[in-house]
């Protein structure tokens, strides 16, 4: 059986030579193992590790443009306030809300707003870090990590 990716986020890290890819899937152990094996086979992969959901900080960003007029604007402001969403743009006929939080919070916010006319919606996908000190994957000396790095196919390393 395969797996479906729920979220995929790519970002820079504190090391300019390394990008971080965060993949979120809902799966069983077999599908998770399949994803790990397939990712480790990629030539450009340095390390693959699984974050424990309970011991991780996960965040997602939502930008939501909703139809807003004099009749529903105060309701929308109240809902935004309850969820600690920011109003980042306001026009005579719409409002743009920004919400950051765990994916479950974003889902709940969207469910509450389901009866309103959503004009546009954009979610970033999940980014995550493990709680506490340095995660075991970050404890290798930088020179050891860099020595393991290979150039992308069709490219060459600068001399």
PLM-predicted stretches and their roles:
Residues 1-20, 24-159:
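Long, contiguous binding/interaction regions
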